[in-house]
Structure formats: C-alpha cells, structure tokens
Amino acid sequence: MKSFVFKLKALSRLKENKRDVALSQFAGSIQEVEKLNTKLTEARDRQEAVFQLMQERQKGSFRGQQIQSLQSSLDLECELISKIELELKQAQEIKVSRREIFLSKDSEYKAVLKLEEKQKEAHYFQENSKEQKELEDIIGARFLFQRINRQA
C-alpha cells in the first residue's frame, strides 16, 4: 500500500501560520483591554480618594488653596478617566475585530485539515480496493490453475 501524501501541505502550513498570528494578535488585544480596565479602575479609585479628601476638608476648617488644589486634582482625574474610557472603547472594538479575523483564519485552517482528512480516507479506501482486487485475482488464478491441473 502506498503511503498517503497530502499535496496541499504547504497551504496547510500557511493557513496554520496565519491562524497562529491572528490568535496571538487576538490574545494581545485581550491583554490590552484587561490592562486598560485595570488602569480605569485605578483612576476611578484615585478620583474617589480625592473626592473623599475634598469632602473631609470642606467639613472642617480649610484654606481656599487646598480646596482649589484638590479640585484641580479631581478635574485631572476626570480627564484621565475620560481618556482611558475612550482608549478602552477603541481597544474593545479592536478586540472584536481581531476575534472575527481569528475565527475566519481558524475556519480556513480547519477546512484545509478537513480536506486532508477526506483525501486520506479516499486514498486508503482506493488502496484497500486495489488490494482486494489483487487478492481476488490471485485467488481466481489459483482456482483456475488447480482446475487445469486436475483436468490434465
């Protein structure tokens, strides 16, 4: 029986490499979203801390400069939060896009693998059929040989 050789092996490797690249880009996008979520949580915590400090200072005696300084810190944190939220939204859109790209590349790769499997099955079926036919021919020839020898 001849061994099976997949003639599209180079295509299979190419599809696999493209799938792996798409997967690593998708994983990078997930990490970026997680990093930005952490950054956003930290910024909100800082904003809350400044806000709490400002409220404490307003209850007791305070100087106008202190409150003004705290207000500017609060404004800066608000701006930072807005910036991070925008970056997070963009990163999530990129993540969704890269996920779709990965799923597409994965589907293409799996289609080539399925084709290889079908061709392998067809090859083995064909080789098995050839062997069966050869065995039948040998059995038929032996039968005829024995028959001829008996008649002679």
Whereabouts are the PLM-identified features?
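Charge-rich amphipathic alpha-helical interaction elements
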Residues: 1-152
